[in-house]
């Protein structure tokens, strides 16, 4: 089954070809440099650039897969959640291509794509498993059963983990996206430099707004000279301290969920799953709790179309297809 996946939910334009269990191509065109000067994604700029990039990205994905579009069995496209304008570009292209080739259209939930991205690697988790989705826009803990059976145990009540990293990086004078910059600096810093707050809720929900506010006040309540000296001399330590605060909260929630459910396999997916400390801590959690932990390769942590193509193929095999009237759902949930 040859499936073309298209992903454009935020600021990455992506296309990939999935062929019966194999990723034949996975092309991603990032707009990070374009949005860096604004400190975050500008929706209008993102959608405009998706329009410019969608055709060459799809052409490249087909070329790298050595695949003829006429041989495709289906087109899978992200229809939510995400930025409305960005979603429209990718889904409209997917709908037109499916209609032109007379093949099924499969609408894919971006979050479902992340959940099953763990199956793109060698460590495919047994079902059921717990899945921690951590990205710029979402932080959710999900119990995953058989295909398409998802039970959300908890989600963020305010900022997502990736969003918190971006905002704290901005306070530190770092670039966008901020998560990778914080992670890089943190590797050389002392996580015990400052004890920033950890919000541990009674259920499995998350909250990172308190941490973000604490960092803001920690810097704001200093003279300009003192703040400049602090950021100059202890940037690595500050990054390590905030990274530790975020990772502690995430790992603690997963540990409690493992104990509450008895599930023996955990997956960590999404852009923040690329965070080196989170990957190490989750592996350590697996050793401590006697559970298997799966984390996708870095290429599949970030937004990509391979996960969309694979999820689409999975739905097509189950007899699911979307009508040509499928519309975008920016606030779609699992």
Swiss-Prot record:
Pfam families reported for this sequence: TsaD
Its GO CC terms are: cytoplasm
> Which PROSITE patterns does this entry report, sorted A to Z?
GLYCOPROTEASE
Q: Which GO terms describe its biological process?
A: tRNA threonylcarbamoyladenosine modification
A GO term, aspect molecular function: iron ion binding
Localisation per UniProt entry? Cytoplasm
Which residues are substrate-binding?
133-137, 166, 179, 183, 275
Its UniProt entry gives the catalysed reaction(s) as:
L-threonylcarbamoyladenylate + adenosine(37) in tRNA = N(6)-L-threonylcarbamoyladenosine(37) in tRNA + AMP + H(+)
SUPFAM superfamilies, from UniProt? Answer: Actin-like ATPase domain
The protein's matches in Gene3D superfamilies, at most eight in alphabetical order, are given as: 3.30.420.40
The UniProt entry, under InterPro entries, shows: ATPase_NBD, Gcp-like_dom, KAE1/TsaD, Peptidase_M22_CS, TsaD
Q: Does the keyword Acyltransferase apply?
A: yes
Q: Which UniProt keywords apply?
A: Acyltransferase, Cytoplasm, Iron, Metal-binding, Transferase, tRNA processing
Q: Which cofactor does it need?
A: Fe(2+)
Residues that, per the record, bind Fe cation: 110, 114, 303
Entry keyword Cytoplasm? yes
> What's its EC?
2.3.1.234
Per the entry, the cofactor note is: Binds 1 Fe(2+) ion per subunit.
Q: Output the PANTHER family linked to this UniProt entry.
A: TRNA N6-ADENOSINE THREONYLCARBAMOYLTRANSFERASE, TRNA N6-ADENOSINE THREONYLCARBAMOYLTRANSFERASE, MITOCHONDRIAL
User: Which HAMAP family does this chain map to?
Assistant: TsaD (MF_01445)
Function according to Swiss-Prot or TrEMBL: Required for the formation of a threonylcarbamoyl group on adenosine at position 37 (t(6)A37) in tRNAs that read codons beginning with adenine. Is involved in the transfer of the threonylcarbamoyl moiety of threonylcarbamoyl-AMP (TC-AMP) to the N6 group of A37, together with TsaE and TsaB. TsaD likely plays a direct catalytic role in this reaction.
Q: Which family does it belong to?
A: Belongs to the KAE1 / TsaD family.
What is this protein's name? tRNA N6-adenosine threonylcarbamoyltransferase
Organism of this sequence: Salinibacter ruber (strain DSM 13855 / M31)
This chain is encoded by the gene named tsaD
């Amino acid at each position: 089954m040859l499936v073309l996946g298209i992903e454009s939910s935020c600021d990455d334009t992506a296309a990939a070809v999935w062929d019966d269990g194999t990723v034949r191509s996975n092309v991603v065109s990032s707009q990070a440099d374009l949005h860096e000067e604004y400190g975050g994604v500008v929706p209008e700029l993102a959608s405009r650039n998706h329009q410019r990039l969608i055709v060459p990205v799809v052409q490249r994905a087909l070329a790298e897969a050595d695949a003829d579009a006429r041989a495709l069995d289906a087109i899978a496209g992200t229809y939510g959640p995400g930025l409305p304008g960005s979603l429209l570009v990718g889904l409209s292209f997917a709908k037109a291509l499916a209609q032109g080739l007379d093949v099924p259209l499969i609408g894919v939930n971006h979050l479902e794509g992340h959940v099953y991205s763990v199956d793109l690697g060698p460590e495919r988790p047994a079902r059921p498993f717990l899945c921690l989705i951590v990205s710029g826009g979402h932080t959710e803990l999900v119990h995953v059963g058989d295909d398409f059976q998802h039970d959300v145990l908890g989600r963020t009540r305010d900022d997502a983990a990736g969003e918190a990293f971006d905002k704290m990086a901005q306070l530190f004078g770092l670039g966008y996206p901020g998560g990778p910059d914080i992670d890089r600096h943190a590797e050389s810093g002392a996580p015990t430099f400052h004890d920033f707050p950890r919000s541990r809720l009674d259920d499995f929900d998350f909250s990172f707004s308190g941490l973000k506010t604490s960092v803001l006040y920690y810097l704001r309540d200093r003279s300009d000279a003192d703040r400049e000296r602090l950021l100059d001399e202890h940037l690595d330590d500050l990054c390590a301290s905030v990274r530790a605060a975020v990772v502690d909260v995430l790992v603690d929630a997963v540990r409690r969920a493992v104990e509450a459910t008895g599930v023996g396999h955990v997956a960590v997916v999404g852009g923040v799953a690329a965070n080196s400390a989170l990957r190490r801590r989750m592996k350590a959690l697996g050793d401590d709790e006697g559970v298997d932990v799966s984390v996708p390769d870095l290429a599949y942590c970030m937004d990509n179309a391979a996960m969309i193509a694979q999820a689409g193929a999975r739905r097509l095999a189950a007899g699911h297809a979307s009508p040509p009237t499928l519309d975008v759902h920016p606030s779609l949930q699992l």
